[in-house]
């Protein structure tokens, strides 16, 4: 894609995101046709934030999730600082189209991971992580039907990133736990609850974290100290509505909650 095409696609997506509007797909003349094109468009969204990048997310970490949106593998997206909240916050609901909340393991990095020729190992990436947190992602898409547009357009649309809620850091003993078997519960208080387990994200949240680090490395992007990486939903996404109270219980690792504002 040319720089002009990238900018036009970026303008279109940003205007729809901030204006809470939808489109069927990016017009063919400026549509990304590869994952690389999608990431190039996504990168032009970051400077519009006006704040340092908060972190990264991974989408489509399960086979079921990949089939649902018709992609053949995970995708990375950017978490913008102005759309990140602490546990207990009221999160805007607005014109959210997807209307789900997801329970996720999030990691805060304590040192940079600079791109390298070969892949990072799980051990290398986990050593570079400083803390793990229970987290809530409230995704959304700028497309009317995000299940049909394909990976390049989904990546351009920031891999369905929208709002994010970060819980307190878990005790340092998390390093001694097998996160793949760690059980958790997601709840919309008074409405529904679903159980989950760490293995639901690429077999282990630490593997999902490593996938993000290696995806960024392949793109020449530094995963920086202080950035947060959220690793995908460990529960079947919870249906939400304005005014709901969402709570995720990660057992000994703590919990995270938020309330949803009005439309």
Task: Please report, for each region that a protein language model flagged, where it lies by residue.
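Buried hydrophobic packing segments
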Residues: 45, 166, 209-216
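Structured functional modules or segments
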Residues: 221, 229-244
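Active-site scaffold segments
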Residues: 106, 209-210, 230-232
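Short alpha-helix capping/helix-loop boundary micro-motifs
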Residues: 31-32, 214-216, 231-233
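Short, intrinsically disordered, mixed-charge
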Residues: 131-134, 138, 211-221
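Catalytic-core "active-site belt" of small-molecule-metabolizing enzymes
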Residues: 2-204, 245, 253-263
